[in-house]
Amino acid sequence: MMKIKIIFSYDGSAFLGSASQPHKKGVQDALSGALSHLGIVSPLLMASRTDKGVHASYAVASVGCGDHFVNLEYLQKQLNKFSHPFIHIKKIEKVKDDFEVRFDVKSREYRYIFSHSSYSPFMASYVHFYPKFDLDKANELLGFFVGKKDLKFFCKSGGDNKTTLREIFIARAYAYKDFSIFHFKANGFLRGQIRLSVASVLKVLEGKMSEKELKEQIEAKKQYNHFLAPPNGLYLSRICY
């Protein structure tokens, strides 16, 4: 028996979330099903969890498989036959037996994509259509998140976190063509943290919340915003070990 690391992407609009679901509608269920077609039935472990409608351009999972799978490129090709169209296997690597796909992670990155173009139903599941905003101001507000923070007011209920302390390495905004993108990198994220953060920044940009209130929420003094940004604009974009 050997352990492999699977790097893959997925279209979150096709699933009820990344974790296994009662009705087998999670990314984990679909990928486990694809593996079972190849005779790999060991439990599949995921590095990160995403909510319904959230996408991933770079996700990681691990699973045990038989030593006879020596040609990992061939395994990748065969696995894609059963994973498409909503999951794509980008790479498969052999890892050490003590590799922990979730707990060995050093950092995770997410991007939230806004489109400022005319609404398109074909893009609606993949971007958040939103009017243009002051990108410099957004960058200033996102900067408040950087550092070691107690983000208890940026967390949905139902998580299994032992602590709400997180270290944010990057929180910035940048433009690409007719899109604005928020980029977050941290040692870990709480459930709903990014969508709550994005929605809070938008509230300040809209004049519905003050900078002082945003800072107080980040400093865990008081919660002013309970709303989450829509899931469709959010992408898990990198996991580093």
From Swiss-Prot:
GO molecular function terms attached to this record: RNA binding; tRNA pseudouridine(38-40) synthase activity
PANTHER family xrefs: PSEUDOURIDYLATE SYNTHASE, TRNA PSEUDOURIDINE SYNTHASE-LIKE 1
Family stated for the protein in its record: Belongs to the tRNA pseudouridine synthase TruA family.
Gene from which the chain derives: truA
Purpose of the protein: Formation of pseudouridine at positions 38, 39 and 40 in the anticodon stem and loop of transfer RNAs.
Reaction it catalyzes: uridine(38/39/40) in tRNA = pseudouridine(38/39/40) in tRNA
Enzyme class of the recorded protein, top EC level: isomerase
Protein's name according to its UniProt entry: tRNA pseudouridine synthase A
Gene source species: Campylobacter jejuni subsp. jejuni serotype O:23/36 (strain 81-176)
Record keywords, A-Z: Isomerase, tRNA processing
CDD domains in the record: PseudoU_synth_EcTruA (cd02570)
SUPFAM superfamilies reported for this sequence: Pseudouridine synthase
